[in-house]
Amino acid sequence: MRIILLGAPGAGKGTQAHYISKALDIPQISTGDMLRAAVKAETPVGLEAKKVMDAGQLVSDDIILALVKERLKNADCSNGCLFDGFPRTLAQAEALKKDGVGIDHVVEIDVADSEIITRMSGRRVHLSSGRTYHVLFNPPKQEGLDDETGEPLVQRADDEEDTVRKRLEIYHNQTAPLIEYYSGWASESIENAPRYRKIKGTGSVEEIRDRILGVLTSC
């Protein structure tokens, strides 16, 4: 079973990807990890990618797709895989289809922007320990201070509301064509079309996990 998981920053995609990978015993495939591994192993594709990166250029879709096809040949992908952060663009999705890389399921974790902004902008971190709090959902005993050390908590730059809004705007601009592409393809009910599901991304981590696994295992 090959799965693409879509979700905005803060939608819980990383957490759910871990659960899905473990429950279905399939690897979670990240293009970043693949790229680093191929460069380190000095595979032909890895050497080509290194040459591009050393020149300060972006790795092309052709190289990324070659990495994906190379990775899918590994034994641990025999029962499928979960794509993490791929495809990112409509061009990559179309290239997958053109090259005959089948996808069984596309799952979108749907969370309103307002909810994501609340989730992310409310995070506070104790930098030296990594302990994380939330001003609404998991507040420290004393406002602004770490429970164990009493040291100040900080808001990471990535969690500032303006930054979150910009990240969401980029996500929607980039992902809307992907959602339209896969949902449209799925609705055609033709052979080899993936199943597309939009899953409510609010509730407990376990509830969301069960919703996703429910649609993946009911077919």
Swiss-Prot record:
Q: Region NMP: which residues?
A: 30-59
User: What is its subcellular localisation?
Assistant: Cytoplasm
| Enzymatic reactions | AMP + ATP = 2 ADP
**Record keywords: Kinase included?**
yes
> What Gene Ontology cellular-component terms does the record carry?
cytoplasm
Its EC number(s): 2.7.4.3
Q: Does the keyword Kinase apply?
A: yes
Query: Where along the chain is ATP bound?
Result: 10-15, 123, 132-133, 203
Q: Which domain of life is it from?
A: Bacteria
Q: What is known of its domains?
A: Consists of three domains, a large central CORE domain and two small peripheral domains, NMPbind and LID, which undergo movements during catalysis. The LID domain closes over the site of phosphoryl transfer upon ATP binding. Assembling and dissambling the active center during each catalytic cycle provides an effective means to prevent ATP hydrolysis.
Quote the protein name from its UniProt record.
Adenylate kinase
Q: Which organism is it from?
A: Chlorobium limicola (strain DSM 245 / NBRC 103803 / 6330)
